[in-house]
Structures are given as structure tokens and as C-alpha cells.
Amino acid sequence: MAEILVKNARIDGAVTDVLLSGRTVSRIAPAIPAPPDAAVIDARGGVVIPGFVDCHSHIDKSHLMDGGRAKYVHGTGAVKGGLTRVEKAAFTVEDIYKRAEAVVKTAIASGTLFLRTNCDVDGYVGLKGIEALTALREKYKDDITIQIAAFAQEGVFQDDKTQGLLNDAMRMGADLVGGHTITFGEGERHIDFILDLAAKDGVEADFHLDESGNRENY
């Protein structure tokens, strides 16, 4: 098992050493002798903290303005949503993978160990995002834990495809199912579908609770 000794690390204000055995912190103490073949890093008094947790992201729709793509403008949510749908219809699995991978690499380099991302599942993008993100999750599984929420961004009952697609997304490896509390007037019907699907598959449900801007809706 590979070992790493971090010397002169600052934890809770005190300078100490940290010994890592594989992915586990095996010892924290001053002046730990370096085990044979251990890699030694001098933290030089830098702060050592647990890895970061990113509990809400949408990496399937990241970097949409890169490379001369969509030129988003200030406007209403409806306008921005319409622009996003135009983009989503043109997504490919490879395109989503490349853009999402850039986010994952940045997250790892910044000390993030856990990332939960929504992934749109609807009649515009289909299951392309799920295919891309499950492959990405597998590639980086030793560096970061990625949870994928099959997300009903465009509602559940706005077409005749989304309900089946959400079920298919769970079969393809989505970790949980996501929805809105207020989406296209679907109301409790939307919430009930998401909760029922989560219960059927024994997974968590992840809801956006703040989409309308009207406190009476809560």
C-alpha cells in the first residue's frame, strides 16, 4: 500500500505531520518518521483540511460559452431556458463528456472529493448526458466520488418521452433522481412521480426548491 507522509502540516492551528496509507489517514502526530519508500511532502506550514464537497452542480451544461458557442444574454428565465434547449438539442455524448471532464479535472485539482451533479434527461437531449457522465464517473472513480441525478429539467409530463427516459436513466446507472417543486404547472404530480421513481429504485430524490422566486409557492 502506497504511503505518503505530509510534514509540517497545520491542523487546528498546530503544526504536525500526517501519514496517509492508501486513501486513509493512518496517523496524525508531530515528527512522524518516514516509512520506507513513502513519498514525503513538506507542507511548509500550510493548512490541511478534509476534501471539499460540491453538493449541487450541472456539469453536463458546463462551458456552454466556450469556443464561440451560445451567446447568452441577460434576460428572463424563459429566454435563457429557450437558449439552453437549442444547445441541448445539438449536444453529443462526446461533447458533454469533454465539457464535463474539464469541470471534474478542476474539481480534483482544487481538492474536491465528492461531487453531485444533475444531468438533464428529457426529449431534447435524451440520455446522452447520462451516457457521458457515467463514463466520466468510472474514469475518475479513484480520484473523486461523482453522484449523478437524472434530472427532469424540462418537466415530466411535457412530452411522451421523459417518463420512460427517466426510468431508463436509472437503469443506465444514475445514482438518484431529480426534479423541481414548481415546473411547468405540473405541481404535485411532478413531485409524486419523482418520489415514486426514487422509492422504486431505492435511491434519494434531489429537488430544486427555489425556482419560482415566489415565496408563496413554498
PLM features: residue spans?
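Histidine/acidic residue-rich metal-binding segments in metalloenzymes
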Residues: 128-142, 158-218
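Active-site gating loops and adjacent loop-to-helix segments of metal-dependent hydrolytic enzymes
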Residues: 63-96, 173, 197, 201-203
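Hydrophobic faces of well-ordered beta-strands that scaffold small-molecule active sites
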Residues: 51-55, 115-117, 144-150, 177-179, ...
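Divalent metal-coordination and catalytic microenvironments
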Residues: 9, 23, 45, 56, ...
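Active-site-proximal loop/turn and secondary-structure-junction residues that shape catalytic pockets
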Residues: 121-123, 150-155, 183, 211-213
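Divalent metal-binding segments
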Residues: 76-127, 181-183, 189
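Histidine-rich, glycine-flanked metal-binding segment
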Residues: 1-5, 10-49
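Di-metal (Zn2+ and/or Mg2+/Mn2+) metal-binding site signature of metallo-dependent hydrolases
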Residues: 46-68, 211-212
